[in-house]
Amino acid sequence: IGKNGAGKTTLIKIITQLLFADKGTVSLFSSHSENEWTKALSRVGSVIESPVAHNHLTAYQNLKYYCMIRHIPNADQVIRETLDYVGLPDTGKKVFRDFSLGMKQRLGIAIALLSKPDFLILDEPINGLDPIGIKEFRLMIQRLNQEKGITILISSHILSELYLLANRFGILDQGKIIREISKAEFETLSEDYIVLKTSDKERACQVLKEQIQLQFKVVNPDNEIHIFGNEQDVKQILKQLTLADVAIDEIYFARQNLEEYFTQLVE
């Protein structure tokens, strides 16, 4: 995860030897030398920046070409199985340049899967996809992980979607990994809180302090107060604020999400 310009694509290009780092080392599948690292790349598939294929060829023809240059046996069977797996079984004579963005992403992943990789790297794969395309992509990636045992590295800034898909997050800022956290760890750290929106902020704070005795913080400039409690506390808060004639615009229960966590780290 990282903002635009944080170094996500640069890091991926270094891992795949498309760029060379000024300093530091890369260990891939426990490689201990540059030669071992290069050999380990045979176990890696990737789609970096945007899917690349021959514009004038169909999906089948593109995979046939890559099977030929990679000397992949039983090409016809491999191609049909791969196209079916990524959801492109019936594209017929349509050529790559006429594909939708979602179809291009699927073909890019199909090309990356031909060599049966253990590690798949995808750079901003859901950019530009519509909601249906994003959901289909998510289901495909989950299948690849669960059915084929492929480890998948995804770079993205669409955090809500990553949260549904990933089980570990690395946060990149200004070229450095500043935090690595599992989904389980994040959920343990996430705070439950009650959001109160009121035009009478000062009076509301006074009531919270004197009558309810829960910790809270004011979030400016939205007249929003975050009260650190659980859902059962909402009724008591409503009761005390109503008795004090505090105007309540909105009140609801919330939990810190990945976007808020990321923003706090990089700002």
Q: Where do the language-model regions lie?
A:
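A generic structural signal for secondary-structure junctions
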Residues: 45, 71, 87, 170, ...
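Short, flexible turn/loop "capping" segments at secondary-structure junctions
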Residues: 20, 186-189, 217-219
